[in-house]
UniProtKB/Swiss-Prot annotation:
Belongs to the ribonucleoside diphosphate reductase large chain family. The modification Phosphothreonine is found at T751. The active site is at N427, C429, E431. This is Ribonucleoside-diphosphate reductase large subunit. The gene is RRM1. PANTHER family: RIBONUCLEOSIDE-DIPHOSPHATE REDUCTASE LARGE CHAIN, RIBONUCLEOSIDE-DIPHOSPHATE REDUCTASE LARGE SUBUNIT. The keyword ATP-binding applies. Its EC number is 1.17.4.1. Heterodimer of a large and a small subunit. Heterodimer with small subunit RRM2 or RRM2B. The heterodimer with RRM2 has higher catalytic activity than the heterodimer with RRM2B. Interacts with AHCYL1 which inhibits its activity. GDP binds at S202, S217, N427, E431, T604, A605, S606, T607.
Amino acid sequence: MHVIKRDGRQERVMFDKITSRIQKLCYGLNMDFVDPAQITMKVIQGLYSGVTTVELDTLAAETAATLTTKHPDYAILAARIAVSNLHKETKKVFSDVMEDLYNYINPHNGKHSPMVAKSTLDIVLANKDRLNSAIIYDRDFSYNYFGFKTLERSYLLKINGKVAERPQHMLMRVSVGIHKEDIDAAIETYNLLSERWFTHASPTLFNAGTNRPQLSSCFLLSMKDDSIEGIYDTLKQCALISKSAGGIGVAVSCIRATGSYIAGTNGNSNGLVPMLRVYNNTARYVDQGGNKRPGAFAIYLEPWHLDIFEFLDLKKNTGKEEQRARDLFFALWIPDLFMKRVETNQDWSLMCPNECPGLDEVWGEEFEKLYASYEKQGRVRKVVKAQQLWYAIIESQTETGTPYMLYKDSCNRKSNQQNLGTIKCSNLCTEIVEYTSKDEVAVCNLASLALNMYVTSEHTYDFKKLAEVTKVVVRNLNKIIDINYYPVPEACLSNKRHRPIGIGVQGLADAFILMRYPFESAEAQLLNKQIFETIYYGALEASCDLAKEQGPYETYEGSPVSKGILQYDMWNVTPTDLWDWKVLKEKIAKYGIRNSLLIAPMPTASTAQILGNNESIEPYTSNIYTRRVLSGEFQIVNPHLLKDLTERGLWHEEMKNQIIACNGSIQSIPEIPDDLKQLYKTVWEISQKTVLKMAAERGAFIDQSQSLNIHIAEPNYGKLTSMHFYGWKQGLKTGMYYLRTRPAANPIQFTLNKEKLKDKEKVSKEEEEKERNTAAMVCSLENRDECLMCGS
């Protein structure tokens, strides 16, 4: 059997040569568990005569990846094989690679189609010695296999389908793309990115340094007008933004309801549903940047709108197709008045914005007065029990995980943009809360700090380093506002006037584990607070320094910060004594700040996978999980747990099988000691009340909002109701992003049992269930404290 080498020569397949190549990449790994010869044996079984060395390396990497559940070092080895393969297939010198990307000729039409901007190439060539020598290629070897494969699939630029960039090239491209001629700043950013202290968001990594640097993740729109022109102008904006790879939040509360009079045609409106189906089809048609991600629109509606019940059904799995829009995402923008009326079991009036105008333009007391005046004037279209609508909301969430829950009054009352007007919606992921109008499309550029990195070897937390890196991130995101490509002019106008940014986090759960703090412990709760105090402090200080150089943002005057009111003041919270807030407030009073908003913990799904961290602010959902790559699915064990079990001599095949059998939980495995059971509780074993409490405690230092998922293994209407009311009373802006559940029953058994039921029995069962759910919901409203104790 022979192998074809990269230069075209043929050579006999030699077992020892393959083993030796793998052995060389095993430095620093735990050789008690990693066995290069075992990988070689498996590789040789899959070979055929005429295999190329590239295919051989790919097979070796995949083989190592399949052994990851034996030990996480196999994932590192798999990545090293794959990275070493990529290094052999790509040019080393950064400036050469950038020239190749610029000189690209499209094979379909023979035209010059540069993949990087001429301005980026010119800067690289003018500074090539410094930039080329600053790159440290060994850092490519620190990715695990699944992080590297994610980069390879979607992030590294390709020439004719073949990857041309190495990960380090991409990070330097991004750094130069942001900082242009400021080479010192570019190299500083490159080092922080490549050492994994933080990461920019996916659109920034995709597009920085290219001809169309659309670096923003989030866009928020409100309807231009309740008219055919307004609806379709807004739709066009959505299409243009989605084409450029932006996720979208759209406020639709101003659109007239079903049956409302249309003066221009002397007809009646069809309401929200047919309009949203048009938006649904646009989302399907226009994906985010050529198949990178599907188009994604979140639709925000206030619960007084007459079409609210139909809105809650739009994502359901059953029902008439023409009453569904399953490719959209749905969110409620909830005034406090609705929550109060649900709590006290009062009536709730549904209205049409055409007949009761302005409700979406006011919040708080002003909203309550206007709403009550419309009720008094008899302009109401329908009256329902507030709890009847609440039941429909809970029912939809139990079935579909949505709508998202955001509290309109908290979002406005605690916003530094409240001087601009009423904020009408959030974004696709519920962490961005920014002002929109018919002339302004809100935008946010994102980055996330890898919180696990700031845990020292002595198990202390390096707040000083966290503040320093936060300041670099602020400067980067602030620069992006000026160099960004905007898909619509209204986005450019908004972003340059208010200059908001969104700094998030990833690896909070990893940081707790490295500090040896169980997620619910008092120590973790204090660290959670101090991490966000530090990020907010560092971000404000950096933004103030920028204002000193460049002046405050255009609409600064009249904002809460301009009056000395910071986010924690709006929550009536006193920070810990970690930082000197008095000095910072004095500095801000003198110079102002450059950015209206700063902090917004987002989901971090893709970038956390690249860096090998747990997502965002989330606890671990399981201690064993599946990672999908193009070549298949791989099971991964939580690497921290595996390290702990290995050190205590408890890691073996049988242990792995027990964890899999327990769905990733270790709580019922007798051999595992209690201290590890506390440390490795999954989200299903952590009190959701604690999760909400920690969200509120960090919320005092988050001037936008946070993507906060609620996990209830088997939700009932009582549990869910008490969760929502607890979050609302804690003052959260986002009460819930997704409701994550686990199926309670085996669906096959469930189907079989259902089949046997007669229609009559089925109807009575459904009625019984509705009664039971209503009773649970009402019980939780009447006995909130007790209900939370028995809930999650």
